[in-house]
C-alpha cells in the first residue's frame, strides 16, 4: 500500500471519520464500517484532506480546470482541494450550488466561478448517486464539460441492482477517482493485524460487492 493511502486511512481513524461496528445504512444493509467526511471539521484535518484529494487528482493526471462541490459536503471539499492545488502550483476555479434557488441579491443556484470548461465533481462518497445526477445536469446546463468525479472512499458496493452507482457512471464514459477504496482499507487492516475487522469487511464485500 502506498504512503498516501495509508496516511489517509490513519487520518480518517484519528478524526473518527472512519468507524467500525454495526451501522444501518439508508439501504437497510448492516455495514461493519461507516465513513462520515463531515467529521473532518478541524482546520488542520481539512487542510490535509484537501492535500489528499489534490495529490490523487495530480497522480491520475486528470485534465481539468474547474472543481464543482455539490451542497453541502462538497463545498468545503472543493475549497480545501483548490487551496491545496494552488500550493502545488495548479490554480483552478471552484463552484458550488445552493439547495434552494436564491431570488434576491445575486440570485441563482450557483456560487463561485461560472460553471464552464473541463469540470470535476468532488464529493466524499457516492451511494445512490442523487447528488451526482443533479451536479451532472447543472454542469451540462451551464456549458461545462464533465471530465470526472473524485471521492474520498469507494465502497466497491453495488446498489439495489447488480451494478454499483459508480459502475453506472463509468458506463457513461466518466472516470471516477478515489483516494481509497474498500480493498485498500482491508489491506491496511491486514497489515495492522486487525483480522477480526478484515473478516467482517471481506464478508460484507462478498455479499454486497459490485
From Swiss-Prot:
Transmembrane regions: none
GO molecular function per UniProt: magnesium ion binding; orotate phosphoribosyltransferase activity
One example of a Gene Ontology biological process annotation: 'de novo' UMP biosynthetic process
Pathways per UniProt: Pyrimidine metabolism; UMP biosynthesis via de novo pathway; UMP from orotate: step 1/2
CC cofactor: Mg(2+)
Keywords per UniProt: Glycosyltransferase, Magnesium, Pyrimidine biosynthesis, Transferase
Annotated GO CC locations: cytoplasm
Residues that coordinate or bind orotate: 34-35, 127, 155
EC number of this enzyme: 2.4.2.10
Family annotation (InterPro entries): OPRT, Or_phspho_trans_dom, PRibTrfase_dom, PRTase-like
Catalytic activity from the UniProt record: orotidine 5'-phosphate + diphosphate = orotate + 5-phospho-alpha-D-ribose 1-diphosphate
Amino acids binding 5-phospho-alpha-D-ribose 1-diphosphate: 26, 72-73, 98-99, 102, 104, 123-131
Keyword field contains Glycosyltransferase: yes
Domain of life of the native organism: Bacteria
Self-association state and partner proteins as the record states: Homodimer.
Family, per entry: Belongs to the purine/pyrimidine phosphoribosyltransferase family. PyrE subfamily.
Alphabetized PANTHER family for the sequence: OROTATE PHOSPHORIBOSYLTRANSFERASE 1-RELATED
Function according to Swiss-Prot or TrEMBL: Catalyzes the transfer of a ribosyl phosphate group from 5-phosphoribose 1-diphosphate to orotate, leading to the formation of orotidine monophosphate (OMP).
Family matches, as NCBIfam families: pyrE
Name of this chain's protein: Orotate phosphoribosyltransferase
Species: Legionella pneumophila subsp. pneumophila (strain Philadelphia 1 / ATCC 33152 / DSM 7513)
